[in-house]
Amino acid sequence: MKPITILSLGVTLVLSMTSCNKFLDENPYSSLVDPDNASKIEKLLGSAYSTSSIAYLTELSSDNIQDDGVNNPYTNQFCEKAAYWETIVNSDGLYDAPYLIWQNTYNSIAHANEALEDIEALGGDKEELQGIKGEALLARAYGHFCLANLFCLPYDPSSSSTDPGIPYIKKRVVNLQPNYPRGTMAETYEQIAADQI
């Protein structure tokens, strides 16, 4: 090979191995919505509602269900799979599972928290932001309420200070696998009530 070709390959190789440390040290978290006005925060808040069908599990424990026995084509799904917390596939081929309810509800809570932080960054006391802030707080409280009802013991005032609750997330999630402490049922319901005021 010609010396110029070898030299240019060597220079290219050396330059390609250098990098900018500042770029690599930054957290890769980014928001899909640039929240610079109330309208964009409202659009973000549309993601603060869970896409999982909590009804698969909650209706079985209510009095809103009628037993049609073997004549019901969904008896197998609702009675057997939901009772054992297995994946349920509906008639459209879509599926839902308890772990997806947990994951999707916390994802919705993360969107509500992101909206709340963006509202504060814009000056949360503005009149146009108050309704959006109230909706975000209510969405966060509702998500935690659903999770507490599905994944915790029933609320009992006599043991709520010792019964384990759920992690109550109040900040934007920036870590890939965050580890949040699990409070008691009393703490969980106090925070749910505080978000509704």
Give residue ranges: language-model regions.
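Bacterial Sec-dependent N-terminal signal peptides
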Residues: 1-29
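Membrane-proximal, proline-rich intrinsically disordered regions
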Residues: 20-65
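Short, surface-exposed recognition loops and adjoining beta-strand edges that mediate ligand/DNA contacts
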Residues: 31-35, 62-72, 153-162
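Secretory-pathway/luminal and periplasmic proteins that interact with or process carbohydrate-rich
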Residues: 53-58, 143-155
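N-terminal capping/interface segment
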Residues: 55-82
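Conserved, well-structured interaction surfaces
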Residues: 80-151, 179, 183-186, 197
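Short coil/linker segments at helix-helix boundaries
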Residues: 150-190
